[in-house]
Amino acid sequence: MLMLENSLANTSQATDTWINHHDSSSAAFSKKKKHDWQGKPYHPISRHYRECFGTKVFKVSVSVAETCPNREGLNGSKICSFCDEWGSAAYHLERDKPLSEQIKINREAIRKRYRAERFLVYFQAYTNTLGKVQKLQDWFDAALMEKDVVGIVLGTRPDCLPSRVLKLFQEYSERSYLSVELGIQTLDDEQLNFLSRGHDSQCSLDAIDKLKEIPGLNVCTHLIFGIPGETDEQLIETARVLSEKKIDGVKLHNLHVLQGTPLEQIFVKGDFAPLSLEEYTRKVALFLEYLDPSVAVHRLAAVASRWNELLAPEWNREKMRPMQFIEDYMRNNQMFQGRLS
């Protein structure tokens, strides 16, 4: 049952660009009747970045955090059922190298492939706010000193936002673009238990509120679709609640099975079946129709970074086909983000 009752009651150039944008764009964007979404039926994150920085911006993923509360056994929690040994890190991360080298290697690869000129350093794997704040500050400073880096993106959990971390976020959001990607996954407590997250939905809602109190901070929530017990009504209500919370972005994933995860054992026993691409597409389209159009969509579906670990579904081996399938489905059915919000 949803726990929503309380929720309802480097560069000065980058800094200047972000501050000027932050004051006006969100309100103005939500009032538009015809959205300039580059031909897509949803608000793509690329559009948000172009509005912020006036050009294309690409994420440079790095891996410096080494663990998370669940792996440390805090509060008696277990490893999340879907998480592999890499802690959600992308396959290409040079995690054994110093931060500056990771940034350089991954930045140059992206620059060469996409002719990119501006970058956000993405602290992706594990829980980046678990540990000493001084270490987090050192990471931020090192990232912002790098050439062509215009901001920071950081992934963390709702239960790892102590006041000292929030204070640090406030300091850096005042002088640079800072986005926090919050892994709430679902707002249903039974489903959170299935995932072995170690926190409840109220913790997620409280975390969103704390982050939204920080001026200039961009807040993106991660969601997983296809958890046992999920209903259409739940997805609609989640879209409505997150819209009312005025989050800035969402990143959507389908629950998929990787080798070496607790979910593998559940899958092998026949107690879990992942969604087909068709059913997942229907769920995503439904969710987006109730999501405020000002919310940027960072990702439409998960993609397995290490194909040799993927057990199911097979379509998670691909990135472009699921995205195109979802876009075509929405266009063919005259659906678009925010139509029913």
Identify the residue ranges that each predicted region occupies.
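N-terminal [4Fe-4S]-dependent radical SAM core
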Residues: 2-120
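Auxiliary Fe-S-binding modules of radical SAM enzymes
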Residues: 2-47, 56-58, 249, 256-341
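Hydrophobic faces of well-ordered beta-strands that scaffold small-molecule active sites
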Residues: 58-62, 119-121, 152-154, 178-182, ...
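Structural recognition of alpha->loop->beta junctions
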Residues: 80, 142-149, 237-251, 321-336, ...
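Core AdoMet radical
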Residues: 86-106, 110-133, 148-161, 177-204, ...
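Acidic (Asp/Glu)-rich catalytic clusters
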Residues: 110-112, 140-147, 169-177, 209-214
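Distinct, well-ordered alpha-helical segments
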Residues: 133-141, 162-171
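Conserved C-terminal portion of the radical SAM core fold
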Residues: 202-262, 278-301
